[in-house]
From Swiss-Prot:
Family named by the database record: Belongs to the Aux/IAA family.
Record carries keyword Repressor: yes
BP-aspect Gene Ontology terms: auxin-activated signaling pathway; response to auxin
Protein's name in the database: Auxin-responsive protein IAA3
Domain notes: The N-terminal half of the protein contains two conserved domains I and II. Domain I includes a slightly degenerated ERF-associated amphiphilic repression (EAR) motif which seems to be involved in the activity of transcriptional repression. Domain II is required for the correct degradation of the protein through the SCF-mediated ubiquitin-proteasome pathway. Interactions between Aux/IAA proteins and auxin response factors (ARFs) occur through their C-terminal dimerization domains III and IV.
Organism: Arabidopsis thaliana
Tissue/organ expression: Highly expressed in stems and flowers. Expressed in hypocotyls, cotyledons and leaves, but barely detected in roots. Expressed in root tips. In the root meristem, specifically detected at the vascular tissue transition zone.
The record's account of how the chain is modified after translation: Phosphorylated by phytochrome A in vitro.
Subcellular location(s) per record: Nucleus
Alphabetic keyword roster: Auxin signaling pathway, Nucleus, Phosphoprotein, Repressor, Transcription, Transcription regulation
Occurrences of domain PB1 (ranges): 92-179
GO molecular function (one): transcription cis-regulatory region binding
Amino acid sequence: MDEFVNLKETELRLGLPGTDNVCEAKERVSCCNNNNKRVLSTDTEKEIESSSRKTETSPPRKAQIVGWPPVRSYRKNNIQSKKNESEHEGQGIYVKVSMDGAPYLRKIDLSCYKGYSELLKALEVMFKFSVGEYFERDGYKGSDFVPTYEDKDGDWMLIGDVPWEMFICTCKRLRIMKGSEAKGLGCGV
């Protein structure tokens, strides 16, 4: 039985070597709260008193910083106000326009135009080409380029195949392609 008397010396524990489990309250506070902050003696005494009471109440929560960094909330509010303004003023319908052989894209607002004729004139001026005339049966004649658009389903169609209001609702982007590539899009092209 004497063999088991000296168990304290060989016991494994989480404390530092050479220290006993029983610490004074002040030492316990300084050991546990090692967060490199200066502590006033009055604060240490209050912590000791509150830990000795061991009440069932939870400690007060820290105030949560909401919306940090403030730039993000500023941007969010700014974007929301711009969205509300655009809804009231009438929303623009912007689509990208590309032309085969042109190294750049353009973006236009379809709501600025009242019909296909105005749109085609604007495209001719923008990309410096001529469209020719559109015939219901033959498509576009008299030009090497054919104006097409991609609808919401992802299909490429000739500009002028559907009524203008339907075109505005379904158009995702415009492409002025070469007539040789546009075979099969229209009736006779």
